[in-house]
């Protein structure tokens, strides 16, 4: 009899070890004329579960930024432990310009958390915030989970 859980683990391990062809963007496009800008942060927040968001205590940091607008989709790594990072100063300066756009709605998931990190990083987000974590149960209140 085959143990599917072991096979799943081995397949997952093999997939994790595969090389990928992803590379960090080499462009910093102007998104200030887009209809919407979607943004998601990846963070290192070691005491989140015990003490709450690290941005309140300067405990942790932004690791990378995923952003989309118009036809552009990109992920900007700035503090990954494994390397491959872009200049944090350059990325954050560009991000400030993109999010300082009061006429463009910003789409986020769990915006309260990401907005705290953006603010702590010196990025002032202007414009309407559309939070998919808030909107999802409004679309289907009977769904068990939105994770």
Can you annotate each of these PLM segments?
Residues 2-147:
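Conserved RNase H-like, two-metal-ion catalytic cores of nucleic-acid enzymes
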């Amino acid at each position: 009899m085959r143990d599917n859980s072991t096979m799943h683990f081995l397949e997952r391990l093999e997939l994790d070890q595969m090389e990928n062809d992803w590379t960090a963007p080499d462009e910093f496009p102007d998104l200030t004329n887009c209809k919407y800008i979607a943004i998601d942060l990846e963070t290192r927040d070691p005491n989140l579960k015990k003490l709450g968001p690290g941005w309140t205590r300067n405990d942790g940091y932004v690791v990378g930024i995923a952003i989309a607008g118009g036809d552009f989709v990109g992920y900007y790594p700035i503090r990954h432990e494994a390397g491959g990072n872009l200049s944090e100063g350059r990325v954050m300066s560009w991000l400030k310009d993109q999010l300082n756009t009061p006429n463009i709605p910003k789409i986020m998931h769990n915006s309260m958390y990401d907005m705290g990190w953006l603010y702590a990083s010196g990025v002032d987000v202007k414009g309407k915030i559309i939070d998919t974590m808030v909107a999802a149960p409004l679309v289907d209140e009977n769904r068990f989970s939105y994770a």
